[in-house]
């Protein structure tokens, strides 16, 4: 049975273009289109599509407001289309706040080297997020995120809302929650890699990390160049630790998280306790910029067994080879479990390779980190 898709955009050209791409895949079928957010909400309720593709800027009701309404009334996996501008980045992050699962640039040439590759990517994204329909739930205000915002200085920090919805249902609670025990290993660096679903996952984890976290955190999120600065600023507004977009020459400091800039590669250089970040173009050899494999591989060379690493939700297998290098050096590797992933691709690749020592639900990863580093 084909995956039913509702296409929402005020541009007739874009509706037609997206519909043609979707309908060219036998797994997918466009069941209707909507020209604004209000119409999208109505059709989502009546047609119950498996996936919605949603523009952000539309008359009558914008895409962000529409996503909020849809998540309240009939939670549906939603893929946003966004412009690659600073304002577009902020709006896209707001849409993820509201419950959208993923996003793609409206200019397909910005996401692939040729048309066929772009078409395939869009089709794959729709097919992947459709699998999460049965796990969708309504957004719930996160008291943790609220208190975190209040704990930071005012001004613009309070203007940025928390990612209030986890788009997938957490694993069913056991009668008695598992109690974690530290392994006793000593760490000097935490490394996290993620892709699809990563913005929500990273915020969930990082907002629970205290300011006295004992070592630096490096973050690799597959994201366009214009998005990473806005995402780092948003995280910094919400977290007790400092979060910044990484710059060439940054000295790694405890209690600070460094987000790899989009369109570039981030590498760790130096020696433990005196390491810096190198930001490079990296050429076209790698499929991803930033690439988890590149960053994790460099961390393995510098920090060896002193790395606590995690692979979170994401499509593909980026991170597997970097984790292989980390594992060879004695580092610790965890993965996000299948049920809490938006896309169980990157964690699955690590799990199947036998590289992960623990598979954890998203809502307990921060707790596990704090236990492991002796803060809980």
From Swiss-Prot:
Q: What is its EC number?
A: 3.1.1.61, 3.5.1.44
Listed Low complexity bias regions = 145-161
Give the CheB-type methylesterase domain ranges.
183-376
Annotated GO molecular function terms are: phosphorelay response regulator activity; protein-glutamate methylesterase activity; protein-glutamine glutaminase activity
Extent of the signal sequence: none
Q: Does the keyword Cell membrane apply?
A: no
Report whether Nucleus shows up as a keyword of the record: no
- Quickly give the catalysed reaction: [protein]-L-glutamate 5-O-methyl ester + H2O = L-glutamyl-[protein] + methanol + H(+); L-glutaminyl-[protein] + H2O = L-glutamyl-[protein] + NH4(+)
Q: What does its PTM field state?
A: Phosphorylated by CheA. Phosphorylation of the N-terminal regulatory domain activates the methylesterase activity.
Annotated Response regulatory domain ranges read: 4-121
Entry remark concerning the domains of this protein = Contains a C-terminal catalytic domain, and an N-terminal region which modulates catalytic activity.
Biological role stated in the UniProt entry: Involved in chemotaxis. Part of a chemotaxis signal transduction system that modulates chemotaxis in response to various stimuli. Catalyzes the demethylation of specific methylglutamate residues introduced into the chemoreceptors (methyl-accepting chemotaxis proteins or MCP) by CheR. Also mediates the irreversible deamidation of specific glutamine residues to glutamic acid.
The record's annotation in PANTHER family points to:
PROTEIN-GLUTAMATE METHYLESTERASE/PROTEIN-GLUTAMINE GLUTAMINASE, PROTEIN-GLUTAMATE METHYLESTERASE_PROTEIN-GLUTAMINE GLUTAMINASE 1
Family statement: Belongs to the CheB family.
- What's this protein's name? Protein-glutamate methylesterase/protein-glutamine glutaminase
